[in-house]
């Protein structure tokens, strides 16, 4: 289960997931929860319960920290499974620089608070721009927005302005739009949507 889901941002209550994991475990199964987009809303995380009742939590470093090229992820789980994963992955599953950068970023709690506030403000600003341009925001997280539209048409329109969006093969009527960075990017997005 992906929580928040990608690409629609739909969230599942943590209590439900913990209960589901217990039910899975009682039948000999696991519940794997991918929390790649969870850093923007830590209250959604079931990581504190990882290892209980067959619950495995996967976390991805690059999304929240904006370091997509840094290949770093985590499996939070019971010790026996952790040891099996460690054995399967070998001694150098993650590079030394990735570990160092990841550790520094994870420990910088002040930056986490700032980033969450900044992302939320930018998400609200993008929502206002999209709605003013006549687009319906149908989902997303504080990292991206999902709009209901002719995805291919708007994707081409935005690409013509050098703005990359994400289309989906499974649905031609949605498009994912990332948050602009600086004021120049915001101006370019507004102009491309006009």
Where are these regions (language model features)?
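Short beta-strands and strand-loop turn motifs
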Residues: 1-5, 32-34, 138-140, 168
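Active-site pre-lysine segment of PLP-dependent enzymes
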Residues: 7-67
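Alpha-helical scaffolding segments of alpha/beta enzyme cores, especially the outer helices
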Residues: 15, 19-22, 121, 125, ...
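PLP-dependent aminotransferase class I/II
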Residues: 54-131, 135-137
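Short amphipathic alpha-helical segments
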Residues: 70, 141-143, 173-175
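Conserved PLP-binding catalytic core of the aspartate aminotransferase-like
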Residues: 119-120, 130-161, 179
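Conserved PLP-binding active-site segment of the aspartate aminotransferase-like
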Residues: 146-150, 159-194
């Amino acid at each position: 289960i992906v929580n928040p889901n990608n690409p629609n941002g739909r969230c599942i209550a943590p209590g439900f997931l913990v209960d589901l994991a217990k039910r899975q475990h009682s039948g000999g199964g696991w519940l794997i929860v991918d929390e790649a987009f969870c850093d923007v809303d830590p209250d959604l995380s079931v990581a504190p319960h990882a290892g209980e009742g067959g619950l495995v939590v996967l976390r991805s470093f690059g999304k929240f920290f904006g370091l997509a090229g840094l290949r770093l992820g985590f499996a939070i789980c019971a010790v026996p499974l952790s040891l099996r994963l460690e054995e399967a992955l070998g001694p150098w599953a993650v590079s030394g620089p990735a570990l160092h950068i990841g550790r520094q970023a994870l420990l910088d709690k002040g930056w986490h608070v700032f980033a969450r506030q900044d992302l939320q403000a930018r998400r609200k600003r993008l929502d206002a721009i999209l709605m003013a341009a006549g687009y319906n925001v149908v989902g997303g997280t504080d990292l991206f927005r999902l709009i209901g539209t002719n995805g291919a048409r708007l994707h081409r329109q935005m690409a013509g302005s050098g703005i990359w969006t994400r289309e989906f093969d499974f649905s031609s009527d949605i498009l994912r739009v990332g948050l602009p960075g600086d004021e120049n990017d915001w101006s370019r997005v507004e102009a491309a949507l006009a």
